[in-house]
């Protein structure tokens, strides 16, 4: 499909720079399978679900992936900003760096340059390899949990570029940019639909008879990237690692067999479930990378309802929601949201989409 079909104009003032407080006070645009639109708030989510429905959340935890350091060992020591994007093993990470032109394979970057050191000492990394788009492989001198601790002490929350370009990360973001379900470290972006949940909402869902299930998909930085090709078929999707346990797969299969609906909280949960589903819709255990790219025409196998935020134009995520609810419906829903003052992107409001069977 033509990529420009997924374009739209968004006023800069519609981009949320802070989350709603409390979290479940965010607005929620309900989009029924018929295309009908309803303006609601997240705390009303239980009213739109049924006893026996199964809610699936992503329990990935965002790491402090934004690091600042200096190149050492040469005549000059330029400042280097690095964003960790994918763990390769116990000591090696793929990262995006700026300015990339200042680094060559073999260079050493020392993080925590402004007098900041972690409790375990300074954090050094060698540039092991360099790609054409500014991505590099960093081989750190520390390993495993010790490296994780050093990154946590020296790093900052990796806010999306549309927020970071307007303000610097602060102490509030350390909590705000983490869901209440966060347990398994590895994401460099939050599964933002999960940011809307509170203990009160969780209790209300349980009282409604909706069961809660956890999966893990470590969200990568590629989630923010627009599709730059003119045709969606030419786009290369980024891969992210995810895990669906046998216990959770069995529970979700049982819920569906009893006429319950699978409600994915976030596109990350949906992409993992669709990756783990067979043609008959049954879920199997999954622990692997997924690069599933969902565009209109895709036949959904595992998910019946999707709760998600409002996404960027020309993004793979707007293409996904257009596949789920229909492109015409989502264009109309987004136009309504913009006109009605909904807040967009990671810290913004939510949509609740009921799958269009056609």
UniProtKB/Swiss-Prot annotation:
Species name? Rhodopseudomonas palustris (strain BisA53)
Whom does it interact with, and what assembly results? Monomer.
Q: Which family does it belong to?
A: Belongs to the QueA family.
> Which keywords does the record carry?
Cytoplasm, Queuosine biosynthesis, S-adenosyl-L-methionine, Transferase
Q: Which GO terms describe its cellular component?
A: cytoplasm
Task: Tell me the function of this protein.
Answer: Transfers and isomerizes the ribose moiety from AdoMet to the 7-aminomethyl group of 7-deazaguanine (preQ1-tRNA) to give epoxyqueuosine (oQ-tRNA).
Recorded metabolic or biological pathway in which this protein acts: tRNA modification; tRNA-queuosine biosynthesis
What catalytic activity does the UniProt entry give for this protein? 7-aminomethyl-7-carbaguanosine(34) in tRNA + S-adenosyl-L-methionine = epoxyqueuosine(34) in tRNA + adenine + L-methionine + 2 H(+)
- Known EC number: 2.4.99.17
Q: What is this protein called?
A: S-adenosylmethionine:tRNA ribosyltransferase-isomerase
Could you read off the lineage of the organism from its UniProt record? Bacteria, Pseudomonadati, Pseudomonadota, Alphaproteobacteria, Hyphomicrobiales
In its UniProt record, which GO terms are filed under biological process? queuosine biosynthetic process; tRNA wobble guanine modification
Checking PANTHER family in the record gives: S-ADENOSYLMETHIONINE:TRNA RIBOSYLTRANSFERASE-ISOMERASE
* Main subcellular location of this protein, as a coarse class: cytoplasm
What Pfam families does the record tag this protein with? Queuosine_synth
**Alphabetized HAMAP family for the sequence:** QueA
User: Which InterPro entries does the annotation name?
Assistant: QueA, QueA_dom1, QueA_dom2, QueA_sf
GO MF, any single term: S-adenosylmethionine:tRNA ribosyltransferase-isomerase activity
* Class of the enzyme per the UniProt entry, highest EC level: transferase
Q: Which SUPFAM superfamilies match?
A: QueA-like (SSF111337)
The cellular location(s) given in this protein's UniProt record come to: Cytoplasm
